[in-house]
Design a protein with these regions (language model features):
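Conserved alpha/beta core of the MobA/IspD/sugar-nucleotide pyrophosphorylase nucleotidyltransferase superfamily
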Residues: 25, 100, 109-110, 114-197
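Short beta-strands and strand-loop turn motifs
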Residues: 4, 30-33, 63, 137, ...
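Conserved core of the sugar-phosphate nucleotidyltransferase
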Residues: 41-140
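Conserved beta-strand segments of alpha/beta enzyme cores
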Residues: 1-2, 96, 162-164
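Residues that recognize and position ribonucleotide moieties
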Residues: 31, 38, 89, 127, ...
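One-carbon transfer enzymes
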Residues: 4-13, 17, 21, 80-86, ...
Length: 197
């Protein structure tokens, strides 16, 4: 089977659905890694699989990483410079995604109180899906939020599906995604520090 990207497959979720449909019901859980996130550690994926295995009603799970001050500063600097950088996520107490944006959400302009945790979560470009959620996804039309933000996971939200946000820990590793040319040196340095240069 040729798994290469076809022009009719607009995003990774659609490509995963096409592969799942072609293979048939062999695999109930499909994991999607995105090529712009080479620093994604294996425990992020393990957390997704654990979350989806623990909840039979969970159709989609994706990792989120609480921003430290350096990551938040990177997001805010990208915005000030007019660059679209990574994606941020907000979710409820049960981990159900409320919204994903290429803007920094929630608003951070009020300043932080001493000892307060940064409430901004970096959405990591990886997903675990149940097969039925993928097949539903490709039957739905692209909505205005997905179109405006350019974020495929918003199609689930726009159609009333739950996207489970699974909080993960960096465990001392630098995590950043390749969104702009200026991200290349940062990612190369992180890979070198992990002995992968």
């Amino acid at each position: 089977m040729n798994l290469s990207r076809r022009e009719t497959r607009l995003n990774g979720t659609e490509r995963c659905a096409a592969v799942s449909r072609a293979l048939g019901p062999v695999y109930d859980v499909i994991v999607n890694l995105q090529g712009d996130a080479p620093l994604t550690p294996p425990w992020f994926l393990e957390a997704l699989i654990e979350a989806i295995d623990a909840d039979p009603d969970c159709g989609v799970a994706t990792p989120v990483l609480r921003c430290d001050q350096q990551a938040l500063d990177g997001f805010l600097e990208d915005r000030r410079a007019g660059r679209v950088g990574g994606t941020t996520a907000v979710f409820d107490a049960a981990g159900r995604g409320l919204y994903f944006s290429k803007e920094v959400i929630p608003y951070t302009g009020r300043g932080m109180k001493p000892g307060e945790s940064i409430p901004v979560f970096h959405h990591v470009g990886a997903y675990a899906y149940r097969r039925n959620a993928l097949l539903d996804y490709v039957d739905w039309r692209t909505g205005p939020l997905e179109t405006w933000e350019g974020l495929e996971q918003l199609r689930f939200l726009e159609n009333g599906a739950v996207v489970r946000c699974v909080e993960v820990q960096a465990r001392g590793r630098v995590f950043w995604e390749l969104n702009n040319p200026g991200d290349v040196p940062r990612i190369e340095a992180a890979l070198a520090s992990q002995g992968m240069d």
